[in-house]
Amino acid sequence: MGMFCNQCEQAAKGVGCEIMGVCGKNPEVAALQDLMLYGLKGLAIYADKARELGARDEAIDLFMIEGLFTTVTNVDFDPVSLAGKLRTCYDMKEKAKSLYETAYREKNGGHAPAIAAGPAAWVIASDLEGLVKQGLEHGINTHHTDADVRSAIEILIYGLKGMAAYADHAYILGKKDEEVFAFFHKAMAATADPAKGLMDFVGLSMECGKLNIKVMGMLNEGHVDHYGHPVPTKVPTGTRRNKGILVSGHDLRMLEELLKQTAGKGIDIYTHGEMLPAHGYPGLKQKYPHLYGNFGGAWQDQAKEFPLFPGAIIFNTNCIQRPADSYKDRLFSWGQVGWPGVKHISGWDFSEVINKALECPELADAPEKEILTGFGHNAVLGVADKVIEGVKAGAIKHFFLIGGCDGAKPGRNYYTELAEKVPQDCVILTLACGKYRFNKLEFGDIGGIPRLLDIGQCNDAYSALQIALALANAFNCGVNDLPLSMILSWYEQKAVVILLSLLHLGIRNIKIGPSLPAFVTPNVLNFLVENFNLGPITTVEADLKAALGQ
């Protein structure tokens, strides 16, 4: 069995990647990531059984999160790195097995029932070639023989991957939760249970969406505890004469540590992609004046943009792509990120990155326009009275949430055109890197409220939900009754879990694009349409008319 991967929006031919991943993933890496999922299922089976007996181990819990995060699109492409993580996965599975057996013996006496087959019985291969061979035996098409059940399993697993990314960020900020840890194990163990059926996995996916709201809330709390509530902030998109380091990814804690270590060294720090919202946090922007600006746009343009940045560049999460030789020697990875030949920084010492930046040429004085960020729920709800007054007076007719992941497909210019054609009496909320499709355009304001409100990163969907729930409360109605339309773009698994969170809340009439997930079968799609009226984007004109009830 060869490579097959369909987890992202760019799945080849709308079906799946079988020769080489559009993301850059080769068959070797795909096999190692498939084996990671298989190993994590084995770990989960034992950890779940141990938990039922009152035994748990935080190291096992944390590895489940890190292991899932590793397999998110555009995170780790390094076979050597993945092989090392697989060895840790096996060790953690065996540790969970011992934990279960000990807990069983202490409670019941005697030996625990042995599990002789499946992922719990996995024995790791001794070398990289053997690991790849094992991975090829456990691809996603082996998850279930029934296509619809397999589709439901994939939705759950991709939701778990997305939630794992957020849980990892939250953990780094000191936020963790026993219910969340337990669910990861329960859900992953369920994917290996042949007795589970379609509706079991639908239910688990809804539970995943529910818990993801909790995880996003934990991450929001971690950010606010460390850096304060975001405030509306103008961010330069040009450069100034100084040495520079460009930070791409999502992790604010890593950015903070880099800011500490570069203070007073004549180095400016620039954000890229999903790091842009960092400028809205007072504990970062106001505390560290060398956090200067945002360079470039969304992740898919890095091959064009990074050669133009003369300093050091570091990724702390996805989305890394194959680096060009023109900047590969200035590129670093951190956390779960990996690419063959790219220097990986373990821990919190960024001296290698700093030294590389000091060796590199200075950036030029090249001022460009400023863009606004920092409209988290605290900032928006701080002017809720104006917003409510604007709606009641008819000055604000409708809200559009236009955001999500960006990507390389030509059809994504739909979101630019949509934002441009939203009527002047409507407000646009945006988040994640999809905002780069239109965040340099001028939208003006309504009664002093900007028509474009950048809420933040993809995980700040939590803020968007708080805004929607507060408005619903103010107007004494449900979220579905608000003059609010959600037209979302997706690319990877964090978008999947955010969608699950929205569906858990019963939010209907969401449109997603530019294409529907390849892993959703027609029958599963029909279920989503019938129960949630979830649908694909069509044309800008038709979707606007539908949203505005015209």
Swiss-Prot record:
Coiled coil: none annotated. Its EC number is 1.7.99.1. The modification Cysteine persulfide is found at residue 405. InterPro entries: HCP/CODH, Hydroxylam_reduct, Prismane-like_a/b-sand, Prismane-like_sf, Prismane_a-bundle. GO terms for biological process: nitric oxide catabolic process; response to hydrogen peroxide. [4Fe-4S] cluster binds at residues 5, 8, 17, 23. It is an enzyme of class 1 (oxidoreductase). It catalyses: A + NH4(+) + H2O = hydroxylamine + AH2 + H(+). Its main location: cytoplasm. It is found in: Cytoplasm. Keywords: 4Fe-4S, Cytoplasm, Iron, Iron-sulfur, Metal-binding, Oxidoreductase. One of its GO terms (cellular component) is cytoplasm. Its cofactor is [4Fe-4S] cluster; hybrid [4Fe-2O-2S] cluster. Belongs to the HCP family. This is Hydroxylamine reductase. The lineage of its organism: Bacteria, Pseudomonadati, Thermodesulfobacteriota, Desulfuromonadia, Geobacterales.
